[in-house]
């Protein structure tokens, strides 16, 4: 049985669970639980696998959540599912909380995207205007440097954007082809977990965490659009593209990226998807909304790369020119201000887009984004002013310092073992780009608690700012009086302190998960069982009846697996009863044995895999306690606990 990943986790019936990792690869593993009482080749299962699922329009679920099917009385059937009607109600409540299907594209979302476009145009436009001004005044050296940073950032962004377009376009075509082949009579499209399927070394992964969800959503939508409905009718939108249509798309995208308009095109496409989600009916609204979310996550990542490859060095360059010439022109001031705003905006906007595109993260409010913007604005302002002051006196040593700091930060990022890109060399390039970001500001690249790493980073930044400012003050030019030097130093340290205060405010009052100070990593808010409330009749059921239901389902799944000629991939079994002791009695928990090596998954997918399995199986069995996952390499307890925590 070939494992095909469509990137969805859903509750197909009150006693049916399906999961596939957010990874578009033939090498990716997947998990599927067959509904008790349904043979593996039944028509009901084939209808669900074709894309009907829990979505009325058959669009499939491109989100990592649990939802209940709304057809065929599935909410009220299946006493063995552990709850009948109550189980369906509990699953519906879980779907509303985890899937966030009630979210709509609002006016604030549109204004936020338009503001991002305005910030981008202001940043790039003022840089080009200033470069032309330098050329007209005969300052060819400043003109060359200013234009170089503009071209460097733009070309880098176009390369990344076109690379992502190629990957998305090929993924949609491959998923459409796969779904079409599954629609043939007699085709076996069931998915199971196999250790060999997940252990491939050459697995293809998208470039960033949000792109994993984005590509899964796009391939899922392409696959479900080409699927059959319950009456056997084929959707028109799922047909293969003609050769002329594909050629036109390739030609259009090539021209857009050659003209350096890839980022603008993605912004316009994001607005278009948001408007479509508003105009569509209830059946298709969420599909366009989540496509908009993932597209905005992509363009936010591109904006982030552009700002730190173009705006950050541009800001340091212009401030250094101002300090050296002892004069400030209006255009230079506008350029520096636009670059600083673009840097802070890109960081805050990317964090919002990343959280919005992940179902295992709570969305961040606009007030929290504003606090994040102020945090990054003031810390980056202190950093670049320090760089400008130091570079005005020590040009050579400033270059050595930047290269040394970048090497250390890149080594630190590589040591964190990020797994965001498709190949090893792309991963190295990505780590090198993030190392450039670390020259100016903090950027989280690893799941888990960041308190220690955040403290170390800003402590190092404070030491560097102090040393560079002190060296500038001691060796500054004689014509620079203390009337200018003392206020400059005050601006540096007061700006850094203000940014740290905003950072503490964000984590203390505006973090989506609540206050982050004095909280242990195993608090109740991280427990998947608290994400929804169980029905009363289920909550009062005894552990013995639940255990009996588990054994019946396990025996039935064992019988189906042996009939299909494969060994069951994961087993749900009750643990041995605890030995008598003086400790209070523990609630019996389930152990899910998964025939996979957990460390073969990238960090972000491991987190989503664990969370999704717990939520799905907990809703499936209505157990009073979340089950425990046991991988082949379960000896790495510290690693497993590390990805249980959130930012």
Curated annotation (Swiss-Prot):
Membrane-spanning parts: 112-132, 142-162, 245-265, 303-323, 328-348, 362-382, 393-415, 425-445, 454-474, 484-504
Domain of life the protein comes from: Eukaryota
One GO cellular component, as annotated: plasma membrane
Main localization (coarse): membrane
UniProt record similarity statement: Belongs to the XK family.
Keywords, ordered alphabetically: Apoptosis, Cell membrane, Membrane, Phosphoprotein, Transmembrane, Transmembrane helix
Entry annotated with the keyword Ribosomal protein: no
Gene that encodes it: Xkr4
InterPro entries on file: XK-rel, XK-related_scramblase
A family per Pfam: XK-related
UniProt protein name: XK-related protein 4
Outcome of substituting residue 332 to E: Displays constitutive phospholipid scramblase activity
Start and end residues of each stretch annotated as Disordered: 1-44, 197-238
Regulation: Phospholipid scramblase activity is activated upon caspase cleavage to generate the XK-related protein 4, processed form. Does not act prior the onset of apoptosis.
Sites marked Cleavage: 564-565
Residues annotated with Phosphoserine modification: 197
Membrane topology category: Multi-pass membrane protein
Sequence ranges of Basic and acidic residues compositional bias: 1-15
Composition bias, Polar residues: 21-31, 207-236
Organ and tissue specificity: Highly expressed in expressed in the brain; weakly expressed in the spleen, thymus, uterus, blood vessels and fetus.
Cellular localisation: Cell membrane
Single GO biological process annotation from the record: apoptotic process
């Amino acid at each position: 049985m070939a494992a095909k990943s469509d990137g969805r986790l859903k509750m197909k019936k009150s006693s049916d669970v399906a999961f596939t990792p957010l990874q578009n690869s033939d090498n990716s593993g997947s998990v599927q639980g067959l509904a008790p009482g349904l043979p593996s080749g039944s028509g009901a299962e084939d209808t669900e696998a074709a894309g009907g699922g829990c979505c009325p329009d058959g669009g499939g679920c491109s989100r990592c959540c649990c939802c209940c099917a709304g057809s065929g009385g599935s909410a009220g059937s299946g006493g063995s599912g552990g709850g009948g009607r109550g189980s369906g109600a509990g699953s519906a409540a879980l779907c509303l909380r985890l899937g966030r299907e009630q979210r709509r594209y609002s006016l604030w979302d549109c204004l936020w995207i338009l503001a991002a476009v305005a910030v981008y145009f202001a940043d790039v436009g003022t840089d080009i205007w200033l470069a032309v001004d330098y050329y007209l005044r005969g300052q060819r050296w400043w003109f060359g440097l200013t234009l170089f940073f503009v071209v460097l950032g733009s070309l880098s962004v176009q390369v990344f954007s076109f690379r992502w377009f190629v990957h998305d376009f090929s993924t949609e075509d491959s998923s459409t082809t796969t779904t079409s082949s599954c629609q043939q009579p007699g085709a076996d499209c069931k998915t199971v977990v196999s250790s060999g399927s997940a252990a491939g070394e050459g697995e293809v992964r998208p470039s960033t965490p949000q792109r994993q969800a984005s590509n899964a959503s796009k391939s899922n939508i392409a696959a479900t659009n080409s699927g059959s409905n319950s009456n056997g009718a084929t959707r028109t939108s799922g047909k293969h593209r003609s050769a002329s249509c594909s050629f036109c798309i390739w030609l259009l995208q090539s021209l857009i990226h050659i003209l350096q308009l890839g980022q603008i095109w993605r912004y316009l496409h994001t607005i278009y998807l948001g408007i479509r989600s508003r105009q569509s009916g209830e059946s298709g609204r969420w599909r366009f909304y989540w496509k908009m979310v993932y597209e905005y996550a992509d363009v936010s990542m591109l904006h982030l790369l552009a700002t730190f490859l173009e705006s950050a060095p541009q800001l340091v360059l212009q401030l250094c020119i101002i300090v050296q010439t002892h004069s400030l022109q209006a255009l230079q001031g506008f350029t520096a201000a636009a670059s600083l705003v673009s840097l802070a905006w890109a960081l805050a906007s990317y964090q919002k887009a990343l959280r919005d595109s992940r179902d295992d993260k709570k969305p961040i409010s606009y007030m929290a984004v504003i606090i994040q913007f102020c945090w990054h604005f003031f810390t980056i302002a202190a950093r670049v002013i320090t760089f400008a002051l130091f570079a005005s006196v020590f040009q050579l040593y400033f270059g050595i310092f930047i290269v040394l700091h970048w090497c250390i930060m890149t080594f630190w990022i590589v040591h964190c073992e990020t797994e965001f890109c498709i190949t090893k060399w792309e991963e190295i390039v990505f780590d090198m780009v993030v190392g450039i970001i670390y020259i100016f500001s903090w950027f989280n690249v690893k799941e888990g608690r960041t308190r220690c790493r955040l403290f170390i980073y800003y402590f190092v930044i404070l030491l560097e700012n102090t040393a560079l400012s002190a060296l500038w003050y001691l060796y500054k030019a004689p014509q620079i009086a203390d009337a200018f030097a003392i206020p400059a130093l005050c601006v540096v340290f007061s700006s850094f302190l203000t940014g740290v205060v905003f950072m503490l405010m964000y984590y203390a009052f505006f973090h989506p998960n609540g206050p982050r100070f004095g909280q242990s990593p195993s608090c109740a808010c991280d427990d998947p069982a608290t994400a929804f409330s169980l029905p009363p009749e289920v909550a009062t059921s005894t552990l013995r009846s639940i255990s009996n239901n588990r054994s019946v389902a396990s025996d039935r799944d064992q019988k189906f697996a042996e009939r299909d000629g494969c060994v069951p991939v994961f087993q749900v079994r009750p643990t041995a009863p605890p030995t008598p002791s003086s400790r209070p009695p523990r609630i019996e928990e389930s152990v899910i044995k998964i025939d996979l090596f957990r460390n073969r998954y990238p960090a972000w997918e491991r987190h989503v895999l664990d969370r999704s399995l717990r939520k799905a199986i907990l809703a499936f069995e209505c157990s009073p306690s979340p089950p425990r996952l046991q991988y082949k390499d379960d000896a790495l307890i510290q690693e497993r606990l590390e990805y249980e925590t959130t930012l």
